[in-house]
């Protein structure tokens, strides 16, 4: 079942992928040239220029499925996946924390961010009874609360 929505320009659906397909695409050479270009721009021109170039990469909606544009009205289903960003890390810090993050039982996916100075950690969360919130307000409240707890957990775990 393909349930993660992939967007171009952050709003337009271009594909749906499984978790395995996403991990494979990130690990393969599919986006390597574009990511290397972003890292080069970051090193040569700075963060602002790199952020502009980064917008050209497809975006993955880990938290929800959408039909059409990425808007509240087009949200089909909340998936409960939360993305934790840890940014502004040195190469040494990245090398130190990646094994820690990979070893955490909550981590589903982890990858180095496009600029090469941070990590993106994908974790799945749900209520104790394995259900997920359904209304937009329940989703917003749940997502915020769980994100806050998980960001704190990973910060403590990685000692950052």
Task: Please tell me what each predicted stretch does.
Residues 1-80:
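DNA replication initiation on ssDNA origins
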Residues 69-74, 98-114, 159-160:
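Catalytic micro-motifs at enzyme active sites that drive phosphoryl/nucleotidyl and oxygen chemistry
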Residues 78-80, 97, 106, 115-117, ...:
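Generic hydrophobic, aliphatic-rich segments that mediate packing or membrane embedding
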Residues 84, 108-135:
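Histidine-centered divalent-metal-coordination microenvironment in nucleic-acid enzymes
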Residues 85-94:
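Short, surface-exposed ligand-recognition loops at beta-strand->loop->(often short) alpha-helix junctions
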Residues 97-103, 125-158:
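Helical (often loop-to-helix) elements that flank the catalytic cores of nucleotide-handling enzymes
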């Amino acid at each position: 079942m393909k349930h993660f929505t992939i967007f171009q320009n952050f709003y337009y659906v271009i594909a749906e992928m499984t978790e395995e397909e996403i991990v494979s695409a990130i690990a393969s050479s599919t986006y390597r040239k574009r990511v290397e270009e972003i890292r080069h721009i970051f090193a040569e021109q700075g963060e602002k220029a790199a952020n502009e170039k980064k917008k050209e990469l497809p975006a993955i909606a880990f938290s929800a499925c959408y039909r059409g544009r990425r808007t509240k009205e087009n949200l089909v289903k909340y998936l409960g996946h939360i993305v934790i960003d840890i940014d502004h890390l040195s190469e040494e810090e990245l090398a130190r924390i990646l094994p820690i993050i990979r070893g955490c039982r909550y981590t589903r996916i982890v990858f180095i961010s496009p600029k090469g100075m941070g990590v993106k950690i994908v974790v799945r969360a749900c209520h104790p009874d394995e259900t997920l919130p359904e209304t937009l307000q329940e989703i917003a409240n749940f997502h915020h609360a769980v994100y806050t707890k998980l960001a704190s957990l990973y910060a403590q775990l990685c000692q950052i």
